């Protein structure tokens, strides 16, 4: 699989195959990839909590919100939650803000997952209570959660209609509008 194929395979997945479990070792391999990525001023302020056990997975699921634009449905569907999570935290003793590092780490984790035949979803809508429920020390601030598992939904990329970038569902398909290249290049596209 070339890099473009890997990027295209990496979609925000909100329904997972319940038959495919994920191991701590698989999660560690993904975090190890993130560990090797660049970090601003090489501070490396990110710390990770791994969840692969059903009880912790259920706790995380109950304290996150998914697909905020889809008001009429609850995701993930009952029985199709992720097999595991990687909770990305910032160690505030090292840095107060590490948004760029978090983005680089999350994308690296998701690309590594795609290479393994897994899918994922970055979750930023997190109940603040989750910090204490997970037993995290005060110095760790949850920045983003990456849900992981084998995807069980039909996700299709389409071009935007006008300026509408809102994702939507039709039947069992999840549509993700993407702006055309010419629209995002400030200095014009190739002629």
Predicted regions and their residues:
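Acidic, surface-exposed loops and disordered segments
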Residues: 1-191
């Amino acid at each position: 699989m070339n890099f473009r194929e890997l990027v295209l395979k990496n979609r925000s997945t909100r329904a997972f195959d319940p038959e495919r479990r994920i191991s701590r070792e698989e999660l560690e391999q993904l975090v190890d990839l993130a560990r090797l990525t660049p970090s601003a001023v090489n501070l490396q302020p990110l710390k990770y909590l791994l969840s692969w056990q059903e009880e912790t997975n259920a706790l995380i699921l109950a304290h996150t919100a998914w697909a905020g634009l889809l008001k009429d449905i609850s995701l993930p569907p009952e029985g199709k939650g992720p097999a595991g999570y990687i909770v990305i935290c910032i160690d505030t003793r090292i840095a107060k803000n590490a948004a760029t590092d978090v983005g680089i780490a999350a994308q690296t984790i998701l690309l590594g997952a795609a290479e393994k035949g897994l899918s994922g979803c970055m979750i930023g809508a997190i109940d603040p209570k989750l910090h204490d429920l997970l037993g995290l020390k005060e110095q760790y601030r949850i920045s983003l959660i990456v849900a992981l598992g084998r995807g069980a939904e039909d996700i299709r990329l389409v071009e935007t209609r006008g300026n509408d970038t809102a994702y939507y569902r039709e039947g069992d398909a999840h549509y993700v509008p993407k702006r055309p290249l010419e629209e995002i290049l400030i200095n014009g596209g190739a002629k």
